[in-house]
Amino acid sequence: MKQVEMNQNSRLTPHFTLGELCKTKYVTADGNIPSRAVIENLIRVCGWLEELRVVAGVRPRSKVFAGVRPQSKVGCAVDAGVRPQSKVASDCTLAPDPWAAPEAGEAIVINSGYRSPEVNRLAGGVPSSNHVTGCAVDIRCAGKEQMIRYAAILLDIADETKRDFDELLLEQHGSVCWLHFAVRSKDNRRKIAFLKV
């Protein structure tokens, strides 16, 4: 039987590759190589990820905190919501701005995407997992705040575009957080949950 190989660098969307969505630490006889139907599902999910990437990178600061933002500079009177210019008075020192939006096009890192049935079993997934059909990804998050922010953005995208998703699961194991996001071609359940695993 001829061994089938997968082009790891094949782009599903401008910022996501097939290799990135099929990577696994498990070595299996099937090579975790997706079918054409699975690739179509991965492309659908990656479309949402592209939108998340853009919105996470350019989202304006929340209006809720407009009047209570911390100063962007230590020892300087800086108007809330106004980003300082590159030329700064010498008596002002930069301080981290916890309310600042990330740079445009924030990288979205995928921990897990497609899993063949064998890889899914080794990973401890349930047989009916959306990962097996290529409909789900686990998005790496730097912490709870980023996980909640990504979830809120995905909910906004769903509401604003009138599209649905199947699962939006905010998951945590110890101090490690990730966001499980799934979109099916039909019969999406819009299941939202916080899970400690």
Q: Model features per residue range: what roles?
A:
Residues 47-55, 104-124:
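Extended, low-complexity, intrinsically disordered C-terminal regulatory tails
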Residues 41, 45-48, 119, 135, ...:
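Amphipathic alpha-helical interface surfaces
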